[in-house]
Amino acid sequence: MTTLELAVIGSSLLENEQRLPIDPAHFEGIPPGLRRHMTFEQGYAEPFGIPDARLEQLFAGVAPRDELLATRDVVLLHKMQAADLALAREGGVLWGWPHCVQQRELTQVAIDRRQTLIAWEA
């Protein structure tokens, strides 16, 4: 069975959005077997005093936001926007708060690009 590669993105295209999908306090509680398949956005934990070098020790590594969107199987992105989905790989999975009813453009981009959206509140 193939293990999917997971991207964790902390930045948002929404103004003043600063929440993170995974609190850095929980990093070491994630099983090592899963951590090997998780790549974080560059600078993800720096506001908490955790440098990228530490994330590279704990996880598969760090990479720029656009690269993660374009290359990973599953992307944790808390407040995704239509522009994010346009950059994400076709057929990929995005997990966060898509708000499909309120964001019709986002929903249409996901349909057109055959993407799967998973809502945290579901």
Question: Where are these predicted regions, by residue range?
Answer:
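Short acidic low-complexity segments
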Residues: 59-71
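Anion (oxyanion) recognition and catalysis
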Residues: 31-32, 56, 111
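N-terminal beta-loop-helix "entrance" segment that forms/cooperates
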Residues: 38-61
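A general structural motif
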Residues: 1-3, 35, 72, 90-91
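Structural motif
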Residues: 9-11, 40-44, 77-80, 97-99
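N-terminal phosphate-binding or glycine-rich loops at protein starts, especially the Walker A/P-loop
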Residues: 2-41
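Short hydrophobic alpha-helical runs that function as membrane-insertion/retention elements
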Residues: 39-40, 63, 117-120
